[in-house]
Amino acid sequence: MSLSGRVAFVTGASQGIGRTCALRLAKEGAAVAVAARNQEKLTELVAEITNAGGKAAAFALDVADEEQVKSAIKAAIAQFGKVDILVNNAGITRDQLVMRMKRADWDAVLQTNLTSAYLCIQQVIPSMLKQRWGRIINITSIFGQMGQAGQANYAASKAGLIGLTMAIAREVGSRNITCNAVAPGFIETAMTAVLSDEFKQNAVKQIPLGRVGSPDDVAAAVVFLASDDASYITGHVLNVNGGMLMG
């Protein structure tokens, strides 16, 4: 699944799933523009990619800030000539029961997890339309499909990404641009590392494959959807959850 000659823009790339996606895309030959808030971690990631012979550039930004997104994608296109692949991975949690949830925490999660995807898609589509080729991949979540108590904001944002994915797939499909989502289940990341051992053990009991997933499992799905092998797949939600949710 060579991605040689392709250019990817990955948000939430400083750690976890986003970082692993960037590394895998670069390994397959894509030039990678990595975006997140943490400049130091982005610089380390770019160094790792370039030291391995790849091409990469870092863009420290707030993905929910429209002007910062415009500036970063414009700069990425100026540097690499285009953006072929967009991976909307940026995500945060602000967990609380809905009756106690602060409006600021609702807004922050929706802005980072959902609005940022809309902003990035809007900025990369002209480049993709021009070349009549594009791959938009939104990282949603199993909780956007089945809900989760205490995560009304997170679940709503991830469910919104699924609806956005299908709408964009219909809008741009005629120009050879696909838009798909990847829905991870329980993945070992910094976001899940803070959970109690008891919670993790109970979660694993619900997974037919009997293990927690890794960022590499998600990145493999992203690389596939970014490749020519997935050229006839669009508007699809690819579950990467070990069987925790089926159907």
Language model features: what each stretch is:
Residues 97-98, 102-110, 192, 203:
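Substrate-binding pocket helix/loop in short-chain dehydrogenase/reductase
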Residues 7, 14-15:
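Conserved glycine-rich cofactor-binding loop
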Residues 173, 178, 233-235, 241:
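Short, small/polar-rich loop/turn modules that mediate ligand/substrate recognition or access, typified
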Residues 121, 157, 165:
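Active-site helix of classical SDR
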Residues 126, 170-174, 231:
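Alpha-helical segment proximal to the catalytic Tyr-Lys
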Residues 39-40, 60-72, 103, 216-217:
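The beta1-alpha1 cofactor-binding region of Rossmann-like NAD(H)/NADP(H)-dependent oxidoreductases
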Residues 141:
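Residue(s) in the substrate-gating loop at a strand-loop-helix junction
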